[in-house]
From Swiss-Prot:
PANTHER family: IMIDAZOLEGLYCEROL-PHOSPHATE DEHYDRATASE, IMIDAZOLEGLYCEROL-PHOSPHATE DEHYDRATASE HIS7. One of its GO terms (cellular component) is cytoplasm. Belongs to the imidazoleglycerol-phosphate dehydratase family. It comes from Geobacillus thermodenitrificans (strain NG80-2). One of its GO terms (biological process) is L-histidine biosynthetic process. This is Imidazoleglycerol-phosphate dehydratase. One of its GO terms (molecular function) is imidazoleglycerol-phosphate dehydratase activity. Its main location: cytoplasm. NCBIfam families: PRK00951.2-1, PRK00951.2-4, PRK00951.2-5, PRK00951.2-6. It comes from the Bacteria. CDD domains: IGPD.
Length: 195
């Protein structure tokens, strides 16, 4: 069974078509209208070996908030749908990624209990025209809609771009690990018998 999903979401603020495959080749076709987010999603797909297609149109003439947040919502929904019943998955993923001066860690539990924790501070409020606070909004909506427990720690760094890049690379690697199928796992990886 293919572990993939397609999500469509239209509001008065955004229109998004998103396709996602867990068992991909790291290919991304991205039209987000938010150049820095496009760059980060490309890294996420490449380092997680996911295939990701996003066609988003939003009210970026106001700012990037709605588009960034809604792409996070759609990607989270796609991850949840692509996982199906979660039988055989590892469930947990952990990745440290350095990017020059920066070091980030992402830890995931695909528990069906959404939670988000973020530790770290970015030196700059913007990268180009992108509001750095939107990284938090994107990740929180992703965790909520994917129903994952997501912990993100930016241990240190001087360059905000490098720090965020390390986060998105680590996110891809941690999610790849958590979604891997382990032949030793019979059913779902929980003593409850369900996730």
């Amino acid at each position: 069974m293919a572990r993939e999903a397609t999500i469509a979401r239209t509001t008065n603020e955004t229109s998004i078509q998103l396709s996602f495959s867990l068992d991909g080749e790291g290919k991304a076709e991205l039209e987000t209208g938010v150049p820095f987010l496009t760059h980060m999603l490309d890294l996420f797909a490449k380092h997680g070996q996911f295939d990701l297609r996003v066609d988003a149109k939003g009210d970026t003439h106001i700012d990037d908030h709605h588009t960034t947040e809604d792409i996070g919502i759609c990607l989270g929904q796609a991850i949840k749908e692509a996982l199906g019943d979660k039988k055989g998955i590892k469930r947990y993923g952990n990745a440290f990624v350095p990017m020059d001066d920066a070091l980030a860690q992402v830890v995931i539990d695909l528990s069906n209990r959404p939670h988000f924790e973020f530790r770290g501070e970015f030196p700059a409020a913007k990268v180009g025209t992108f509001d750095v606070e939107l990284v938090y909004e994107f990740l929180w909506k992703l965790a909520l809609e994917a129903r994952m427990n997501l912990h993100v720690i930016v241990h240190y760094g001087r360059n905000t771009h490098h720090m965020i890049e390390a986060v998105f690379k680590a996110l891809g690697r941690a999610l790849d690990e958590a979604t891997m199928v382990d032949p030793r796992v019979k059913g779902v990886p929980s003593t409850k018998g369900m996730l």
